[in-house]
Amino acid sequence: MSYEKHSDAKASRYAWNQPWNPFEVTLSDPTYPMNLEEKNQIPYRFQSVPDDVPEVPHIESRYKNLPGNNIYLCCGRLQMSSQYKAFLISLFALILPGVLFFIFSAFWLWHHVSPAVPITFAYLYALAVVSMFKCSTADPGILPRNAYSLTYNPAHPWSVIPEDRKVLVGSTRSDSVFVNTVYCHTCHLYRPPRASHCHLCDNCVEYLDHHCIWLNTCIGRRNYRYYFIFLLSVVLSALYLTGLGFYTSIGSFHESTDTNFAAHLRRPWAGVSFFLGIYGALGAILPGILFCYQCYLISVGQNVHEYLRAKSTETEDVHPFHDSIWLNFLVVLCRPKNVSYVRPTRKSYV
């Protein structure tokens, strides 16, 4: 904002050369002391928009035209596979013990042990539920299709046959190797290293570990950390539930007047707590095995897909993506989460 001077002094076109008094000014042209040429150089965003400016066409998100077996919700922010029956079973198996615990066991533990006990279980249980939904609804790293379509040329019939391409892995290391990139005839692209095509989702996924039917999604680069946290929180919650369930049923028996433990289990809170102890012990077996298996694969620099389909498992060659154990965990679990390839609507991303 500029001002106009009310004195007889010779005015200069530059504000810093004007000997003006702040008490002798009035509001004037906001572009003063600019001349006409300088006014025309004002950025367009500060000028008034004329009525005849054409509208920018709407750019649709890529997920709307992606021919895969995925269901998208909330403008592509939530997505999962179309085979959701096993996911409903796993969701019910996770919700049931939590509801029973807070109805029958949490009250006795709150008043007879400590309020911190049910609060700790609530934190672990909430972490398991949130990580489950985050893992199952996040984009695992689906690669956009038709990135390299092969066109048939009658003069060169072999033009539709993809050529092998190699990518140098670990270029700054002395043990760097070349890794072959496979051409996907379904998605029409050269898959990056460690990417694979999922036949259930019908998409190429970056860093595909495996397709989990119980979470109804592929476990890839963008949701692997949520899958790891889900396994860890489920194991801790199940083991914690086992101890709390047995402690509640046995502790309430010693404080009651019942002489028979079998008769004491007929009481609702005692019987349900004993059931939760057995339920937690059985429920910790499979997630515990998967968690230990994932820790082993991370430590050796592989994933499930690479481990099961390795062609040179009997050789002594070091895996090209293997580094130290701590660095492997750091790369897999703490690497930045890149932008989804199929959801963005910005023009810079499309």
UniProtKB/Swiss-Prot annotation:
One of its GO terms (molecular function) is protein-cysteine S-palmitoyltransferase activity. Keywords: Acyltransferase, Endoplasmic reticulum, Golgi apparatus, Lipoprotein, Membrane, Palmitate, Sporulation, Transferase, Transmembrane, Transmembrane helix. It is an enzyme of class 2 (transferase). It is a multi-pass membrane protein. Autopalmitoylated. Disruption phenotype: Abolishes palmitoylation of ras1 during vegetative growth. Delays mitotic entry. Disulfide bonds: none annotated. Its EC number is 2.3.1.225. Residues 182-232 form the DHHC domain. The chain crosses the membrane at residues 87-107, 113-133, 226-246, 271-291. The erf2-erf4 complex is a palmitoyltransferase with a major role in driving sexual development. Palmitoylates ras1. Palmitoylates isp3. Palmitoylates rho3. The DHHC domain is required for palmitoyltransferase activity. This is Palmitoyltransferase erf2. It comes from Schizosaccharomyces pombe (strain 972 / ATCC 24843) (Fission yeast).
